[in-house]
């Protein structure tokens, strides 16, 4: 079944349960495909699942797999839930961090070291979703004021861009934010965090589906 799905480059939800046979990690919690809502996001996830499966079969270069996405919206819209469920749907490890954790030590070298550690942890998993919350805290170079502050965040943003340009095979980055407009446009360009999904608060029907 899974070989036929790979040949047609189209995995159905029933096929996704077979991905573990390809060496993909099992993850706890529901799959994205089992959750109510997220219809646009599910369509993208199916495309990525196709490509990840082909990559694991050495039939597709990782550079041809979507490298990242942004989920944004007000608090309570399920951004973290989406990231975990997306990883589950693809059988990938879920590695979660925040820009705030990277910044905790305050010194640029410590921030960069923490950033590299997150990417290294994801790279070591042989297939992982690196979920980065507080994504807007990376900064926007057009909004920086003060020479010292500007230099600090230019270093941080430039290093993040370098990591995205040289993203390890098997790593998909999901950024999450309440404030998309505060993110540097270079971070969101094609080939980096190129898919953008706005999440809204669930309506009554979706809430009902989630509890039944």
Could you say what each language-model-derived stretch is?
Residues 1-28:
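Interdomain "pre-motor" coupling segment immediately N-terminal to P-loop NTPase/helicase cores
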Residues 16-19, 29-32, 57, 164:
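Intrinsically disordered, low-complexity regions
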Residues 26-34, 196:
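Short hinge/gating elements
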Residues 36-212:
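Walker A/P-loop NTP-binding motif of AAA+ ATPase domains
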């Amino acid at each position: 079944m899974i070989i036929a799905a790979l040949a047609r480059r189209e995995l159905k939800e029933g096929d996704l349960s077979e991905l573990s046979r390809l060496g993909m990690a099992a993850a706890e919690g529901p799959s994205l495909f089992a959750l109510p809502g997220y219809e646009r996001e599910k369509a993208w996830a199916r495309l990525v699942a196709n490509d990840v499966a082909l990559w694991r079969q050495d039939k597709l270069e990782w550079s041809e797999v979507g490298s990242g996405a942004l989920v944004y919206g007000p608090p309570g819209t399920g951004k973290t839930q989406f990231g975990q469920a997306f990883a589950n749907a693809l059988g990938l490890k879920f590695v979660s961090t925040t820009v705030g954790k990277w910044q905790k030590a305050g010194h640029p070298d410590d921030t960069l070291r923490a950033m590299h550690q997150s990417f290294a942890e994801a790279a070591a998993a042989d297939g992982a979703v690196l979920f980065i919350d507080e994504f807007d805290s990376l900064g926007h170079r057009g909004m920086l004021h003060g020479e010292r502050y500007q230099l600090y965040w230019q270093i941080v943003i430039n290093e993040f861009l370098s990591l995205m340009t040289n993203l390890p095979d098997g790593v998909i980055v999901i950024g999450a934010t309440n404030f998309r407009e505060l993110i540097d446009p270079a971070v969101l360009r094609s080939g980096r965090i190129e898919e953008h999904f706005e999440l809204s608060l669930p309506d009554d029907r979706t809430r009902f589906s989630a509890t039944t």
